[in-house]
C-alpha cells in the first residue's frame, strides 16, 4: 500500500499563501483609480440602504456586529458584542459565550475555555466533549474566525478550545439556518458562527487584564495596537490561563487545564480598498474527568475493578456517595485532551469601479488533537493506554464580487478547499505480551522485510499496538459556485433568490497496516493461533480505498419588507447539504461502505419580525426579534459508540426541528438590558439502529426551553470613578437523553436548571495615575451565586465505561455544572 503523507498539502498551502501575498502586493502597488468609497448616487441609494458600497475588510467585519446589520438581515441572526460576551465569565471560552444567543445551549465538563464542549444552535450541534455514545447531528454548524473557516472539512467537527480566550474577541455573529449562498461554507446545515477578533485601529494603544480566582484559576489577556505606521494598522492580541477543575478525585487529583490563544493582523487601506494579513493560534488542553453515576452501584468503585470484574475495596463512585463534584481516582482512569489550531490568511477587498467590488481570501489551517488516555479501571486491561493523535490540513481560496445596480445587488463567486485528515489512534498495554511459537514477517514502509524469530516476546506499545488501532486518510475537496441577486423593486422590499452548486469529493485510504505493520502482522498471527493471544486488536479501517463524488444544487430565497422605519418583516427558505461525520473507530468508509447518496440534507424555512429604534424616548439601541423556524434534517448518519470507545454501529435518521426564538436588547439611559428565549421541539420521523425502529422519538439533547436575561448599569461617582454592577441569569429546560444501551433516544429527561451570576466593576480614570494610563478597572465576578447543584449533561449507560454490563445497564450518569466561583480582575488600558 502506498504510504500517504501530508507533504503535498504543505507544498500546495505554501503556494496558496505565496499567491495570496503576491495578489495583495499587486493590489496595493497598482495605481488606484479616482474612485470615492462613498455609495454611488442616484437610484441605488434611493431604493434601499442595502445598496451601500462597503469595501474595506474592517468595515465588513465590524458592521456584522452592529444592530442595524441584524435589523437589515432577512434571517433571525444574533450579534454578541464584547459586553454580551462577558456573560460567559472572565475565564469562559467560546462555548460559554455563545450560550447567550437565543436557541443556543452548551454542555461540557469544565468552566474555562480550555475544556471541550458541545454547542447546540436551534437543536443542531457542533463541538464534541466525548459525552454520549450517539452523535445525532454533530458538525452541523459552520464556525469561522475573522471570516476564515475553522471546521475540519473531512469530519465536520470543530473543538471549542480552538477559541479559548474571549478577551481577544470583538464579538460573534450567529446565523440561524444555512443563510444566503454568498455567506455559506461546507457544513451550514443548521447555521454558522463567526468569531470577530479585535481589529487593527488607526490609533496606538492597548490593554492588559490579569485574573485570579476559584479553583486556582489564573488568566492574562494582552492587546497591543500599533496605530497607523506607513499606512499599516496592526494588532497583536493574546491570552493564556490555567485552572484546576471543580471536580476532585478521592485521591486528590484536581484535573487541571491550560489554554492560550494568539492573534496578529495587519491591514493597509488604499484608495479603492484594502489588503490584510492575519495569523491565529488557539490551544486548549487538560485532564478530562468521566461522567459520574447519579446513584451508587455495587459494581462501581472509585478504585476500579480487579481482572475478574470485581470492585476493589473503596467508596462506591457516585454523586450520592463520593460527592456531587467528585471524579474517578486518577490511578485507575485519566485522560489528557489536547486541541490546537493554526490559521494563516490573506484578504483583499478592491472597488473596481463605482458598481463593482472584488473580494478574495486565501488561507491555510492546521488542526491537531492529542488524547493521552490511561484506563486501568479493570486491572490488566489490554487497552491500558490510548494515544490518539489525528491531524488535519486545509487550504482554500474564496473569490467573489458584489455588483451594485440601481435595483439589484448581485453576488457571484465561489471557493475551492482541499483538506487532508488522518485519524491516527493506538490502544495498547506494555503488559500485554506474546511469545511467538513460529516466525512472523512484516514489511515496514520503505524497508526490507523483517522477521520476528520463534521465541521472540513482543509487548504492546504506541508503535506496536496490541489492541485496536487506525490511521486512515481522507482527502476531501470542496467546490462551491454561487449566484444571488438582492432585488429591491421598491425602497421597502428586498427579495434575494440564490443558487449554489456544490461538490464534495473524497478519496479515502486506509493506512493502518502501513502505519503499524508489525501490529498488523501480529494481529494476523493471533488470529491463526487463537486462544488468549495478547495482540487481539484490529485495524479499525476494515474496508479498502474508495473515491466518492457528490454534486448538488442548493436553491434559496430570502425576503425582507420594511413597511415602517422601525418594523421589518422577513422570511427565508433554503436547502443545504454536507458530508456526514467520519473519522472515529468505525462508520462510513471505515466499516460501512460509502455507497449511494451519503450527503446529509437540510431544508429550512424561517419567518419573523424585527423592531428597531436607534432612539425612542429615554430608550436607545432598541432591537427586538421574533422568529419561527422549521428545519427538516434528512439522510442522517448517526454513529453509536460504547462508553469505552468501541464503535457499535451506524444508525440512520430523519428528523424535524421547529421552534421560536425571541430576543430583545435596549439601553435606558445608563442601564443596558438583554433577554433571549427559545421554545423548541425536535422529533425523529425515522430512526433505525441495528434493525430496530424508533420512529417518532424525541431528538436527544434539545432543550425544550432556554432563557437568559441580563442587565448592567453605569454609576458615575466621585472624581470620575464609574461603577458597573451587572447581573445575569440563565435557564436551560428539560431535555431528552440518549440511551447508550439501546443506541437510541430515550423518553427519559434530565432536569432543568437555572444559574444566577453577579459582577461589580469599578473603572478609575487615568488622571488618578498622572495620566500614565487611560484607565484602570477592578472587577469581581461571582458565577453561580446561589451555588446551585445541577448536571449540565446526563446519559443512560450501556455499562461499558465502568464494566457493569450485562448485570447493570441503563443507569443515569452525568457531568455536573460548575459550583459557585469567584474571580477578580485588574485591567489597565493605555
PLM regions with names:
Residues 407-409, 415-417, 470-631, 712, ...:
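Structural signature of Gram-negative outer-membrane beta-barrels, strongest in the C-terminal barrel
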Residues 351, 357-363, 369-373, 562, ...:
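Membrane-embedded beta-barrel scaffold of Gram-negative outer-membrane proteins
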Residues 62, 74, 93-149:
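Extracytoplasmic beta-strand/coil segments of soluble accessory domains associated
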Residues 51-89, 115-118, 174:
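N-terminal periplasmic "start-of-domain" segments of outer-membrane beta-barrel proteins
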Residues 491, 495, 617-634, 650-740, ...:
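Gram-negative outer-membrane beta-barrel transporters
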Residues 150-156, 162-207:
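A beta-strand signature from Gram-negative outer-membrane beta-barrel systems
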